[in-house]
Regions:
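Core segments of transmembrane alpha-helices
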Residues: 87-96, 103, 172-185
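Alpha-helical transmembrane segments of multi-pass membrane proteins
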Residues: 47, 51, 124-135, 181, ...
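Cytosolic/stromal cytosol-facing helical appendages immediately following the last transmembrane segment
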Residues: 1-37, 60-74, 145-312
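Juxtamembrane helix-loop-helix connectors linking adjacent transmembrane helices
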Residues: 70, 79, 94-130
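Function-critical hydrophobic alpha-helical transmembrane segments in multi-pass membrane proteins
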Residues: 117-156, 165-166, 178
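Membrane-water interface at transmembrane helix exits
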Residues: 54-63, 96-104, 135-143, 185, ...
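Hydrophobic alpha-helical transmembrane segments
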Residues: 36-44, 86, 121-125, 175, ...
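Alpha-helical transmembrane segments in multi-pass membrane proteins
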Residues: 29-92
């Protein structure tokens, strides 16, 4: 994949560098300085384009704009999410470059030619299971009190998420959670185009679990409904694609609470609507009856999550 990143952008860099220098360090395609710089800038720019395009399409065409009036939505949250994401990207790209550089030098198991179409489902499944497991444990590790406050808390600033929350991380947090995807192709063979598609799909999935569109209340697939609980209550649903490791690790929480067939987010949505129309006369949070304005009851959800937080 690194060779494509360089090859298709070489003409742009050739033209730009030839305007300002004659040094082979920047003009030669074999120069490590040029390769490292080009990889870094490409990762930064393409990462930003993918993030802004994916999150913006979601935000303007699918995201419920009413969510912006939610009492737990922060002032200027969308702007702050975009700022943190774009601020982090260049740093994330710096530490990501070695993965691409050593891939270019032939250390990965990526390959160009497919021998059989059966290699696709096998590699997809392997990539999916491998990253699902490691992202779970890395994410859970980031909730350890020794690192949580400086590393992962920035992402938990957002109690109610928007599509732009997806990459709104500390740069090392975003990098840490992307490492399993990079590591996979150093351990297992994968067809290059499939890796590229999987990598983009991973980014889009990240956006989708923050977009407030609860398309699934599936028991196996980890959706936005589950990740919403993670942002509100901290100690549940650390997974990325499936609920498997949350179940094994004892951190699974179903989006269905006390009421059969009634989803947690639906309760929040109703309470939000009630707030917009005045006061609610009763709120059921965590099975306890509470009375008062919606802001109070939803704050109680977050407060209970805070009380319950014990790192692991
Ligand atoms: Zn988290
Ligand atoms: Zn999140």
């Amino acid at each position: 994949m690194a060779d494509w990143l360089l090859y298709y952008t070489d003409p742009v860099y050739d033209a730009a560098f030839s305007l300002v220098t004659e040094s082979p360090l920047l003009l030669s395609h074999d120069s490590d300085v040029r390769i490292l710089f080009q990889l870094w800038l490409n990762l930064t720019v393409l990462g930003a384009i993918l993030y802004l395009a994916g999150a913006s399409v979601n935000f303007y065409f699918f995201f419920d704009q009413e969510t912006l009036k939610h009492p737990k939505m922060l002032k200027n949250q969308v702007r702050r999410e975009i700022y943190l994401s774009l601020e982090s990207l260049p740093y994330t790209a710096i530490v990501t470059v070695p993965w691409f550089y050593f891939e270019l030098k032939g250390y990965s198991k990526l390959y160009d030619t497919l021998d059989s179409w059966w290699e696709i489902p096998g590699a997809m499944l392997g990539f999916f299971l491998f990253t699902d497991c490691l992202v779970y444990w890395i994410h859970r590790g980031f909730h350890h009190p020794s690192v949580y406050w400086w590393l992962h808390k920035p992402h938990h600033t957002w109690k109610v998420c928007t599509p732009y929350s997806a990459l709104a991380f500390h740069w090392l947090d975003g990098y840490g959670q992307s490492c399993p995807a990079h590591l996979y192709v150093y351990l297992f063979p994968m067809w290059k185009p499939l890796y590229m598609v999987s990598f983009v799909a991973l980014q889009l999935w990240s956006i989708s679990i923050h977009d407030g569109i609860y398309i699934s209340n599936d028991e196996i697939l980890l959706s936005c409904a589950h990740h919403t609980i993670h942002h509100l209550e901290f100690n549940y649903n650390f997974g990325q694609y499936t609920t498997l490791w949350d179940r094994i690790g004892g951190s699974y929480k179903k989006p269905v609470q006390e009421f059969a067939n009634e989803m947690y987010f639906d309760k929040l949505k109703r309470k939000k609507e009630a707030l917009l129309h005045g006061k609610v006369d009763g709120g059921d949070v965590g099975g306890k009856q509470k009375t008062g304005p919606i802001a109070t009851t939803i704050s109680a959800v977050a407060a209970e999550g805070m009380k319950a937080r014990r790192g692991f």
